[in-house]
Amino acid sequence: MFKTEEMLALNLQLFSADVTPINVTTQDGMSPTMKTFYDTALLENAREQMIFTQFGKKQPMHGNKVEWRKFNTFAKALTPLTEGVIPSGQTFGMTKIEATTTQHGDFVAVSDRLELEAYDDVIFGATEEMGATEGETYDTLTRNILVAGNSVAYANDKASRSALTADDKLTPELVAKAATWLKKNKAPKIDGSYVAIIHPSVAFDLRNSEEWKEYHKYNDVAPIFKGEIGELHGVRFVESTASKVFKEGEVATYATLFLGKDAFGILDPEGEGMEMIVKTREQIGGPLNQFSTIGYKFCHGAKILYQERILRVETGSSYSALDEAN
C-alpha cells in the first residue's frame, strides 16, 4: 500500500522580515562612503531648486511648532512737552506669530534587472532626479504660503485677477511702483536691493522693454542671488519656473512677488531637515532581493512675518494663451 501524503502550500512571504518597499530600516547595508556620496548628490540637486526659500529668515526649532514675536512700533513724539506736565506715554506690546511643520516625502523602487543590466548608474540617476523633485516640492510649498499674502496689485489698475488679459504685462513703471510701495512701508532691503521672484514668461516681456535694455546696456549688474537675471529700479529679479501661474478660462495670469528683508520665515526643525534614504536590495527587496529604493523625506514650515514687506503683483504675459496653471 502506498502512503498518501498531503502537500501543504506555503506562503514564503510569511517568513520574510519585510516584504514591502515602504518600511524604513537602517542604512547598515551601505558603506558610509557610498551613503555620503548619494546624500551629497541629492541635497546638491535639491538646493539648486530652492529659489523662494533662499530669501526666508531661518528659524531653528526643536519641536513641531515655533512662535515668532515682533515688537510693535511707536509713534513719533512730535508734540512739544509742557513744563511740569507728564506726557501720557505709549503702550508697549508685541505681536505673536505661530507656525507648524508638515512632513513630506516620496520614493522610487528600482528592480534588480534594471540595476544590473542598465548601462548607466541607475541608483545615482534616480538620486539626482529625486533630489531635484525634493527641492521643487520644498520650494513650491514655500511659494504657496507666500502667494496667499494680503497685499496685491493688479496690472493697469485692474480690479481683480479675472479682469486681467494678456495685454496687462509687467512694465518698468509697475516695477517702480512696487519698489515705491516697499519703500513707503519701510521694508528693509536684501543686500542693498529689493527682490522680485518672476516667472520666465513675465521676465520675457520685461526684458524686452526699452527701459530694461537701456539700463543693462550701461550697467553691468553682477548676480548675487540664485536664479538672478538682472536689476531695475533697485529691484533684483530672480527667475523661477515655480512662480505661481493662475488659469481662469483661457488666460494665464502670473504672480510676481516683490520682497523686503525677512518678509517671511522658514522653519528649520532639528534632525528633520532634508534626508536622503537609500535601501539596498538586501535590506528592502523581499525574499528574492528583487528591488532597491531611493527616496527623500523632510519637514517643511513657512510663515509670512511682515505683510508690509511682501507685495504680489499679478499680470498677464505674451504667453498667457499658452501657459497652464501650476
What are these regions, as identified by a protein language model?
Residues 2-100:
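N-terminal "assembly arms/tails" that initiate or stabilize quaternary assembly
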Residues 56, 183-187, 225-227, 283:
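A generic local secondary-structure boundary/capping motif
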Residues 97, 102-118, 122, 179-209:
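Structured, hydrophobic secondary-structure cores that serve as assembly/anchoring elements
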Residues 16-49, 164-177, 208-326:
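Sequence/fold signature of self-assembling virion shell proteins
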Residues 68, 128, 192, 196, ...:
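Hydrophobic alpha-helical segments involved in membrane association or supramolecular assembly
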Residues 75-79, 205, 246-247:
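Short, solvent-exposed loop/turn elements at domain surfaces
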Residues 72, 112, 298-302:
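Beta-strand elements of well-folded, non-transmembrane domains
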Residues 113-185, 312-314, 318-325:
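Alpha-helical scaffold segments that mediate packing/assembly in large oligomeric complexes
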